[in-house]
Amino acid sequence: MRADADRDSAETRAAELRARILDADHAYYVLDRPVLADAEYDRLVRELAEIEAAHPELATSDSPTQRVSGAPSERFERVVHREPMLSLGNIQSDGELDEFDARVHRLLGLAGDVQVGYVAEPKLDGLAVELVYEGGRLVQGSTRGDGVNGEDVTANLRTVGRTRANRGVPERLAGEVPPRVEVRGEVLLFKEHFEAMNRQILRAGDEPFANPRNAAAGSLRQLDWRVTARRPLSFIAYEALVPGAEPGGARAGPWAWRTHAEKLEALARWGFETNAENERCEGIAAVKAYRDRMAERRFALPYDTDGVVVKVDDLDWRRRLGAASKFPRWAVAFKYPPQEEATRIRRIWASVGRTGILTPVVDFEPVRLSGAMVSRATLHNEDEMRRKDVLEGDWILVRRAGEVIPEVVMPLKERRTGEERPFAFPAECPICGAKVVREEGEKVYRCTGAACPAQLVGRLTHFAQRRAMDIDGLGDKLALGLVERGLVKDFADLYAVPFPAWQELFSRPRKEERDAKAELPQKSAQNMVDALERSKATTLRRLLFALGIPQVGEATAATLARHFGELARFMDASEDALLAVRDVGPETAREIRAWTEEPQNRRVVERLLAAGVRPAPETVDAGGPFAGKTVVLTGGLAALSRDDAKAEIERRGGKVSGSVSRKTDLVVAGAEAGSKLEKAQALGVRVVGEEEFLRMLEE
């Protein structure tokens, strides 16, 4: 019983962690609006990885530990990378660096005294992109996206660095070049250019960018390339891939490199800027010495950096080392400890979220951390605030590692004067005036107001998010504008907002769009109307998640959708019928039934259907090659995202698992398949490639 309880607790925590990490990924990579500090994000990922290591059966195929974090926006055409653009595993200690070196030795079968050659370089804080050249001419440029699919931003990339020699994207390569080459690197803003750009923004009376990374991403991902052209972006190249010339391929021509250092030399010959701080290191001790030198110089460098990237230099060794589903085994990123600063609290106040939860927010005197000015942090709940013993008026230590929202580390009690006071949660909601309560056994205070505007804004953005109704462009500011103007009181109202109202909401361009064409408000309004129309064709699982039903996260929404099949059956399900659903317990069943019985909720659902929202019934194919089978996905697929492949398998009656065991029926191996493929082969599990997998889907 104890083991079952521990597993249930681990499963619940893993689901919570995945949800927080995926939301943070979406905010960082898609919206260019970070919501977590690096240190907090890394802590959540590590905690999730530890849970999945202790309970392999809980490792889902869509877990953030299994894939690259970004996601392509629907504002741009999708580009499929020939080779996945994987992210790097993060480490933070000498011990982890030694473990990385030992793992390289072990996987290559090298004796412990063999010095592995590494290339070390500063970890750039910008936007990863891929440039494709054919016959020496630029034919396509794309963002990394989710690692398999990126965004086509060719027109924008052609403008990068045109005003600064050797810091741009060449239109044509110099010298002898292969028929096709894929160049990867980082689009970034140097500190001097970032500060100059922000000064111009401030003179115009607008809000400056928080940091160079956000500014670079926002500048590159513009619908109007002329906006990008006016931004002082730079490009630094760090990788080149030539089809057939990688180790194990044809290895023909002068670009059949043996080492990464040779690649960097070729990139420089072709006209790219490479990082002048790159250094080849013999052995891990030399890497540590380089890391220490860079840590001392990091703030003197012309760009922001939060660590050092370490790569095996020998390309044949890289091929042998391969990659896991998310990270290459031949490279790692060593991240510096979060920078810390002392500052003084101005005030503590309570913000109200979509579920009515009041969160204590700390406003403090602005400090510069990791290149950005920050002045706010959250304390999550009253218990954390009391545990850290943070008082209004305190001097505090805050830290940040590249994100917008910092973390309060501790109060500096030795600097207290006696005038500091504990923060007391308000008895009434600061937004709507309704009563605020903290129920017995709960850690949070909640607003009891059913019509609270702050809750409505939160519910609208939840409804619109990518994994729910996927209404591209509907974020916090737009939702607030809708609520303030009285245009929207529930989800269904979104589909009734008239076109002129959307135009009015978009009439003041955002700072990154102020240089765009004059018809931008009309174009933005039309884009929003189109996004709303597209969202009407959804699935039952997405709609159930979007509605914000208590206790119904993504996983539960999918389970409910598969069980009931149709929205009407779900809405009319009794508490007993809900209890019959796998993984739905008594509390969840009660919460769901209370929600579906509420007349206002039923009216909103009816109005959504009347507006044209049509959730496709969840049907399960009882026949076919996947029915009743347990399938594991590994590596990147060119034709489908991991989420789409999982959905197709489940729709055909299969179950997708995150780990390979003797109970696994099938492994689908895409590009750069990792240890799961090796384990499947060792266990004799059937393995199919992407081409055969797509044929099976058509059966």
Curated annotation (Swiss-Prot):
Q: What class of enzyme is it?
A: ligase
Transmembrane parts of this sequence: none
Q: Which GO terms describe its molecular function?
A: DNA binding; DNA ligase (NAD+) activity; metal ion binding
Asked if the record carries the keyword Protein transport, the reply is no
Q: Domain named BRCT: which ranges?
A: 621-699
Q: What is its EC number?
A: 6.5.1.2
- Which SUPFAM superfamilies does this chain map to? BRCT domain, DNA ligase/mRNA capping enzyme, catalytic domain, Nucleic acid-binding proteins, RuvA domain 2-like
Coiled coil: which residue ranges?
none
Cite the active-site annotation.
Answer: 123
Record's catalysed reaction(s): NAD(+) + (deoxyribonucleotide)n-3'-hydroxyl + 5'-phospho-(deoxyribonucleotide)m = (deoxyribonucleotide)n+m + AMP + beta-nicotinamide D-nucleotide
Q: Which cofactor does it need?
A: Mg(2+); Mn(2+)
**What's an example GO cellular component term for this entry?**
cytosol
Q: Which PROSITE patterns match?
A: BRCT, DNA_LIGASE_N1, DNA_LIGASE_N2
Fetch the CDD domains from UniProt.
BRCT_DNA_ligase_like, LIGANc
In terms of Pfam families, this protein maps to: BRCT, DNA_ligase_aden, DNA_ligase_OB, DNA_ligase_ZBD, HHH_2, Nlig-Ia
Question: Which amino acid positions bind Zn(2+), per UniProt?
Answer: 429, 432, 447, 452
Q: Which residues bind NAD(+)?
A: 38-42, 87-88, 121, 144, 186, 311, 335
Domain of life, per UniProt, equals Bacteria
Q: Which SMART domains match?
A: BRCT, HhH1, LIGANc
Q: Its GO biological process terms?
A: DNA repair; DNA replication
Q: Keywords, A to Z?
A: DNA damage, DNA repair, DNA replication, Ligase, Magnesium, Manganese, Metal-binding, NAD, Zinc
NCBIfam families listed in its UniProt record: dnlj, PRK07956.1
Record family assignment: Belongs to the NAD-dependent DNA ligase family. LigA subfamily.
User: What does this protein do, in the record's words?
Assistant: DNA ligase that catalyzes the formation of phosphodiester linkages between 5'-phosphoryl and 3'-hydroxyl groups in double-stranded DNA using NAD as a coenzyme and as the energy source for the reaction. It is essential for DNA replication and repair of damaged DNA.
Q: What is this protein called?
A: DNA ligase
